[in-house]
């Protein structure tokens, strides 16, 4: 079998024009599919960045919340009620909101403010400069070193700014796992300072972060919170809710889906058509092989090998090209959101296999129909 | 001489009902090891259809074909493919060489189909290219060869698996007179042996002198088999 596959390989790659056209079709399709889905994955990860960075196992929120940036304040009694639920190890308040800071050069810059529980600082980021205790100092804020920090003029420890006529000072620089979707720099402070500095409605708790005593307690906590008229979600459930919002309620997911389908069809039509032409041009040769003594299944193996080989090379080139462009884009535009996930790679791989299967199916049908007698007859 | 091929009452038709046309009708003949048998006749007389049935390519509607005492049409499709691979060598009218493979790789195809090691197959192919006088062209693409050279590559491919039965379809149709005669000299003197039977379908009366016997066909029937006086 190895020998006949080698013949198939040589027939394929020695026909440089056709082979290049086949590769271009599949590479293009894979590139577009992976690129589209990676951009969407990047957006989804960024949209859940607060949830990822704070790391709480459970989040309590108003049932109308559909993404982490649009919190609906909770009454203080909900915090007490959640703390009293059996199975809750601890529960802390979180302030999450937006504000305008005035920089020393007079420019106003919108920022995201996260106010951590004063007692536990639960969800605090990892500091790369400064000490976490300094967050309790007067006017203290910790800035996140991400793609957006340059919008604050690349602050260092000691940099001052104004926030609603309050003086603010950077006491630490932190790093986090994911930066936000909306291109805003992030400042951490304590919960009490956040509600003091930022004009707030009657209720000030954006979310309650919960640590259950055990994984088994999660269901009970969720049902008890539901009885209070609120919603408790695990970290994964909350991220899924946010993802669903962007997928189904913003039109973004539908557009990406359409673009992915179009990419698939473009790739299928280019490579399918080229492969079909390749088979047609070699049809007499396949017939001659049959006449010489090749069995039908050997010809099928040859065609499947050619299709699979082209698909795999095209897949590799497409993924490589996509990663290269994402890397280059991130160098030029740091906040560019695109993430190649294993799920995306697996999806594109399945799609490319489908392209190869459909293309080879057409070829196989043709080759199996050719009769050696037709070759003999000329 | 031993009987290589024994065809009995071979019939093949195409179409059904009023449209049924007989390509070959009740043809019987024997061919022997060590002889060159020409099948001649006008276009549409059934020569190619007859050879296709004898070589395991086209199933007859009735009649039997015994090759080396085996009724080939009682075999399964896979066994018939094996039969063609092991017992029959074809030289097609248009050669059907693969332009994307080297000359040696083209010749090695039957051995590769027989699952022989690639390198060994290429070595054997080069030996047969040497036999047909083309060893120095082994690494060239067939398109770089002349018509006569391509014909010899096709002959080397037909020979490489050492078949008992060699079938040539119009071997000189696209060659000039001199080249055609040289090819036939080569077939007669170097290819034919006592354990091989060669069947040649041709229109070309210039090469009839190389036949041991000539079978004439008209309208799907045999109209006579003549033995050449000088053979």
Placement of each model-derived feature along the sequence:
Chain B
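ABC family nucleotide-binding domain
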Residues: 4-5, 10-210, 214-217
């Amino acid at each position: 079998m190895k020998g006949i596959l080698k013949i198939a390989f040589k027939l394929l790659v020695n026909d440089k024009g056709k082979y290049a056209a086949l590769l271009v079709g599949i590479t293009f399709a894979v590139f577009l599919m992976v690129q589209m889905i990676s951009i969407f994955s990047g957006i989804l990860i960024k949209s859940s960045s607060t949830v990822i960075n704070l790391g709480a196992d459970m989040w309590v929120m108003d049932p109308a919340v559909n993404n982490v940036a649009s919190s609906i304040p909770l009454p203080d009694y909900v915090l007490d009620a959640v703390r009293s639920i059996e199975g809750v190890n601890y529960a802390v308040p979180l302030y999450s909101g937006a504000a305008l800071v005035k920089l020393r050069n007079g420019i106003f810059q919108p920022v995201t403010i996260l106010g951590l529980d004063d007692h536990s600082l639960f969800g605090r980021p990892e500091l790369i400069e400064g000490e976490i205790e300094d967050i309790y100092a007067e006017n203290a804020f910790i800035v996140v070193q991400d793609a957006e920090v340059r919008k604050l003029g690349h602050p260092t420890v000691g940099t001052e700014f104004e926030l609603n006529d309050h003086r603010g000072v950077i006491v630490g620089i932190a790093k986090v796992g994911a930066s936000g979707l909306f291109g805003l720099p992030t400042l951490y402070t304590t919960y009490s300072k956040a509600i003091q500095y930022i004009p707030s409605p009657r209720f000030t708790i954006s979310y309650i972060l919960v640590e259950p005593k055990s994984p088994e307690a999660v269901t009970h906590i969720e049902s008890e919170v539901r009885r209070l008229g609120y919603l408790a979600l695990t970290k994964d459930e909350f991220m899924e809710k946010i993802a669903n919002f962007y997928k189904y309620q913003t039109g973004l997911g539908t557009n990406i889906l359409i673009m992915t389908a179009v990419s698939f069809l473009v790739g299928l039509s280019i490579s399918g058509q080229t492969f079909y032409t390749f088979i047609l041009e070699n049809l007499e040769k396949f017939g001659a092989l049959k006449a010489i003594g090749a069995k039908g299944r050997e010809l099928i193996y040859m065609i499947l090998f050619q299709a699979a080989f082209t698909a795999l090379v095209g897949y590799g080139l497409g993924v490589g090209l996509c990663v290269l462009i994402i890397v280059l884009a991130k160098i030029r535009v740091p906040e560019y959101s695109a993430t190649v996930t294993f799920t995306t790679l697996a999806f594109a791989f399945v799609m490319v296999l489908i392209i190869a299967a459909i293309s080879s199916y057409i070829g196989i049908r043709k080759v199996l129909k050719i009769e050696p007698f037709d070759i003999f007859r000329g | 001489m031993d009987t290589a091929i024994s065809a009995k009452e071979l019939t093949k038709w195409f179409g059904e009902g009023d449209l049924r046309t007989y390509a070959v009708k009740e043809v019987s003949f024997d061919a022997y090891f060590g002889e060159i048998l020409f099948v001649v006749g006008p276009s549409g007389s059934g020569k190619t259809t007859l050879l296709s049935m004898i070589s395991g390519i086209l199933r007859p509607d009735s009649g039997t074909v015994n090759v080396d005492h085996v009724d080939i049409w009682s075999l399964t499709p896979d066994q018939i493919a094996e039969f063609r691979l092991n017992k029959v060598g074809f030289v097609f009218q248009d050669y059907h060489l693969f332009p994307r493979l080297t000359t040696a790789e083209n010749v090695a195809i039957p051995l590769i189909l027989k699952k022989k090691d690639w390198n060994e197959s290429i070595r054997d192919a080069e030996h047969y290219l040497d036999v047909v006088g083309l060893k120095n062209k082994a690494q060239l693409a067939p398109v770089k060869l002349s018509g006569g050279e391509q014909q010899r590559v096709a002959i080397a491919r037909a020979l490489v698996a050492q078949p008992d039965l060699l079938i040539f379809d119009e071997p000189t149709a696209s060659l000039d007179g001199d080249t055609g005669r040289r090819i036939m000299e080569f077939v007669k003197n170097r290819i034919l042996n006592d354990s091989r039977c060669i069947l040649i379908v041709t229109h070309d009366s210039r090469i009839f002198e190389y036949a041991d016997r000539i079978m004439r066909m008209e309208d799907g029937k045999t109209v006579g088999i003549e033995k050449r006086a000088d053979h």
